[in-house]
């Protein structure tokens, strides 16, 4: 028995996506968003799918790729302050199960949105642009890279 030893992470952001039930909660949240959009009377099914995809990807971009730092005071000498949540996830190790899940989920949503919009060119362009905006920052080659100095500080 270790008395007086903390069993917490140095940076809680690194493991939050591996928590019990996180993936199920995430999927249920996306499903709930879609049901809410479908319940709005003047939205057609293709519009609801496109909005679900765009809102999901916008939220994913903001929370995983735009916001930097951690809401916790961490003993890592400020290293996490300069990293996005995606870069902190699983201590920066690439191709973990959480990273794979959060990479494949927008792709699955994109396929669903494309299918239910019947590949309408307008919806297809919007959905593709939205997908690329969240897939490109997830590439291992862009880990820690700030294009044109955007989000550098």
From Swiss-Prot:
Any single GO CC term annotated in Swiss-Prot or TrEMBL for this entry: endoplasmic reticulum
Spans within the Extracellular topological domain: 122-123
Keywords, in A-Z order: Endoplasmic reticulum, Membrane, Transmembrane, Transmembrane helix
Transmembrane annotation, as ranges: 27-46, 47-64, 101-121, 124-140
Coiled-coil segments on the chain, per record: none
A Gene Ontology BP annotation from the UniProt entry: myelination
Tissue specificity annotation: Widely expressed. Expressed in adult and fetal heart, brain, lung, liver, skeletal muscle and kidney. Expressed in adult pancreas and placenta and in fetal spleen abd thymus. Expressed at intermediate level in pancreas, placenta and brain but low in skeletal muscle and lung.
InterPro entries in UniProt: ORMDL (IPR007203)
The family this protein is said to belong to: Belongs to the ORM family.
Function: Plays an essential role in the homeostatic regulation of sphingolipid de novo biosynthesis by modulating the activity of the serine palmitoyltransferase (SPT) in response to ceramide levels. When complexed to SPT, the binding of ceramides to its N-terminus stabilizes a conformation that block SPT substrate entry, hence preventing SPT catalytic activity. Through this mechanism, maintains ceramide levels at sufficient concentrations for the production of complex sphingolipids, but which prevents the accumulation of ceramides to levels that trigger apoptosis.
Name recorded for this polypeptide: ORM1-like protein 1
Pfam families registered for this protein in UniProt: ORMDL
Topology versus the membrane: Multi-pass membrane protein
Gene: ORMDL1
Cytoplasmic side: 1-26, 65-100, 141-153
Subcellular location: Endoplasmic reticulum membrane
Domain notes: Ceramides bind to ORMDL3 N-terminus and stabilize it in a conformation that physically restricts the accessibility of the substrates to their binding sites in the serine palmitoyltransferase (SPT) complex, hence inhibiting SPT catalytic activity. In the absence of ceramides, the N-terminus is flexible and permits substrate binding, thus liberating SPT from inhibition.
């Amino acid at each position: 028995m270790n008395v007086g030893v903390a069993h917490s992470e140095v940076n809680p952001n690194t493991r939050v996506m591996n928590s019990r039930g996180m993936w199920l909660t995430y999927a249920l949240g996306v499903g709930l968003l879609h049901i809410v959009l479908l319940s709005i009377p003047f939205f057609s099914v293709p519009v609801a799918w496109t909005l679900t995809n765009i809102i999901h990807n916008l939220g994913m971009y903001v929370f995983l790729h735009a916001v930097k730092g951690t809401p916790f005071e961490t003993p890592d000498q400020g290293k996490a302050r300069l990293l996005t949540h995606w870069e902190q996830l699983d201590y920066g190790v690439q191709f973990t199960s959480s990273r794979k899940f959060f990479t494949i989920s927008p792709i699955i949503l994109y396929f669903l949105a494309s299918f239910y919009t019947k590949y309408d060119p307008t919806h297809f362009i919007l959905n593709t642009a939205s997908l690329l905006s969240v897939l490109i920052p997830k590439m291992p080659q862009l880990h820690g890279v700030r294009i044109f100095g955007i989000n550098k500080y």
